[in-house]
Amino acid sequence: LVYLRFLIDHGNFADELGTVNDLDAILVTHQHPDHLDPDRIVDLVRANPDARVLCDPMSVAVLSRLGVEGQAHTGQTAFGELTVTPVGAMHALIHDEIPRITNVGVLLSAPGEPRFFHPGDALDAEPGPVEVLAFPLNAPWQRSREMTDFLRRHDAPHAIPIHECLLQRRGRDLYLGQADRLGGSDRVI
């Protein structure tokens, strides 16, 4: 039996996680700091020198500026019998005035094991049948009905909520910042 350790989207909302060692791969779905924390990624890679860093195409440049070698996740990558498959291409639309970036969800699969899908920040990717589905609980780009439609569409027997930190203090600040910047100029927030 072989155990592999993967970390997906170690962003700036994961403050209780601390240092993680013995990783085989660090997977980054996109460059937003709640998924790729520029203040932590260098130390994370240093603590895991043998880990491969797979990311969406635009995050390669972000990582390069930090001195971290990342590989654009554009095709299947094997780790022994486990296959990591990129699914999707673009981040969900937040607002017409915010440029869209790349977002690559990840499908983890191995013979005889449950298939796991993490979508990053998009609900339009189609990984095929999965047994374990990570689903964004709350996001500035997502309505509640879109979240429930995502769960219904994939109909996975197991679902793991992700992206829930926006419901805490820092998330409130994020929503208020967007309301201030994008909600019009005739109000004080």
Question: How does the language model describe each region?
Answer:
Residues 123-125, 138-142, 156, 165-167:
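Short Gly/Pro-enriched loop/turn and capping motifs at secondary-structure junctions
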Residues 41-42, 46-92, 177:
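Portal/gating segments that form or line small-molecule/metal binding sites
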Residues 57, 137, 162-164:
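Short secondary-structure boundary segments
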Residues 11-55, 131-134, 155:
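Active-site metal-binding motif and surrounding structural segment of the metallo-beta-lactamase
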Residues 33, 59-60, 124, 166:
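Alpha-helix capping/helix-boundary segments
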Residues 64-80, 148, 152, 157-189:
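Binuclear metal-ion centers of metallo-dependent hydrolases, dominated by the metallo-beta-lactamase
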Residues 1-21, 72-129, 141-146:
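Core dinuclear metal-dependent hydrolase active-site scaffold
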Residues 8-9, 27-28, 85-87, 135, ...:
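Redox-cofactor binding/interface segments in oxidoreductases and associated redox assembly factors
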